[in-house]
Swiss-Prot record:
GO molecular function: 4-(cytidine 5'-diphospho)-2-C-methyl-D-erythritol kinase activity; ATP binding
Protein name stated in the entry: 4-diphosphocytidyl-2-C-methyl-D-erythritol kinase
InterPro entries: GHMP_kinase_C_dom, GHMP_kinase_C_sf, GHMP_kinase_N_dom, IspE, Ribosomal_Su5_D2-typ_SF, Ribsml_uS5_D2-typ_fold_subgr
BP GO terms, sorted: isopentenyl diphosphate biosynthetic process, methylerythritol 4-phosphate pathway; terpenoid biosynthetic process
Catalytic activity, EC: 2.7.1.148
Family according to the record: Belongs to the GHMP kinase family. IspE subfamily.
Species of the source: Rhizobium leguminosarum bv. trifolii (strain WSM2304)
Gene3D superfamilies, sorted: 3.30.230.10, GHMP kinase, C-terminal domain
Function: Catalyzes the phosphorylation of the position 2 hydroxy group of 4-diphosphocytidyl-2C-methyl-D-erythritol.
UniProt keyword terms in alphabetical order: ATP-binding, Isoprene biosynthesis, Kinase, Nucleotide-binding, Transferase
Length: 298
């Protein structure tokens, strides 16, 4: 369904922006097994889209390039879990709703698609139902859906620590022209963490007063994604796709999250668009998307 069609068919629509881990440091592990992370996160101007409409009974429909991959996932889909959790808060006032998810992002690909969808569902349903929750209550509810959901609620540049629930805005982070690239190979997040050789790595360090793309690019380049080496063991195509981005002129390449999506930062959107088109020509069966990330000032 085209974006214009979604807006016409559904009275309330929300964007679920792709979440990009510019840096991800694994700094420890809690007694309950959750890993402690330091992350520099931003969000892209591409992603999934959700539509919401009053209905006689609850309904959930899918479209988009990757929609079929979620078909039959009604028991575990985060959008439906978000609906049900929010309905517990609002009770009978939360009338039945038809939710449509236009799934444009690859599934389980390290760019927060499911978490962003859940966050967009929370935002959209509150608008449709004409209700709201206090900020802290909404953040607590979001965390029940997953560690990434609170930051996806924000959808702006931030630093996330702990398991992802300790969030701090980064107002000075600039926008970046970028290509997202994914070989469409699944990566098991638990297996990636299991293969980590060290789990008590150095924390993310950001100098105060950073400004400008060049300064931030140097900081990001000096940082790392501790999950990339084990992910490359599981999916060798990650190394291939990173090299392809570099060959097309990327200033910096890195894997996002637990993979397999990689990003390449380019000097301009024109260069990013040219690179994405060329890469798609080389591998039309893979995913390439030129995009621009949001700035801290938004």
């Amino acid at each position: 369904m085209p974006e214009a069609g979604l807006a016409e068919a559904f009275g309330v629509t929300e964007e679920a922006r792709a979440k990009i881990n510019l840096a991800l440091h694994v700094t420890g592990q809690r007694a309950d097994g959750y890993h402690l992370l330091d992350m520099l996160v931003t969000f892209a101007d591409c992603g999934d889209r959700l539509g919401f409409l009053p209905a006689q009974t609850d309904a959930f429909t899918l479209s988009g390039r990757f929609g079929e991959m979620l078909a039959g996932d009604g028991g575990t889909n985060l959008v439906l879990r978000a609906r049900d959790l929010l309905r517990e808060q609002f009770g009978a006032l939360a009338f039945p709703v038809h939710i449509h998810l236009q799934k444009n992002l690859p599934v389980a690909s390290g760019i927060g698609g499911g978490s962003a969808d859940a966050a967009a569902a929370l935002r959209g349903l509150m608008r449709l139902w004409g209700m709201s929750l206090p900020v802290e209550a909404l953040a607590s509810l979001a965390l029940k859906l997953g560690a990434d959901v609170p930051m996806c609620l924000e959808s702006r540049p931030l630093i996330a620590r702990g398991i992802g629930e300790e969030i701090e805005a980064v107002p000075d982070l600039p926008a970046f022209a970028m290509v997202l690239a994914n070989p469409l190979k699944g990566v098991s997040t638990p297996e990636v963490f299991r293969r980590l050789t060290t789990k008590n790595n150095s924390a993310l360090s950001l100098a105060p007063g950073l400004s400008g793309s060049a300064g931030w690019l140097a900081v990001i380049d000096a940082a790392r994604n501790d999950l990339e080496p084990p992910a490359r063991q599981l999916v060798p195509e990650i190394a291939v796709i990173s090299a392809m981005l570099q060959a097309r002129g990327a200033l910096l390449t890195r894997m996002s999250g637990s993979g397999a999506t990689c990003f390449g930062i380019f000097a301009s959107m024109a260069e990013a668009q040219d690179a994405a088109a060329a890469l798609h020509g080389e591998r039309p069966d893979w995913y390439f998307q030129a995009t621009e990330t949001v700035s801290g000032g938004m």
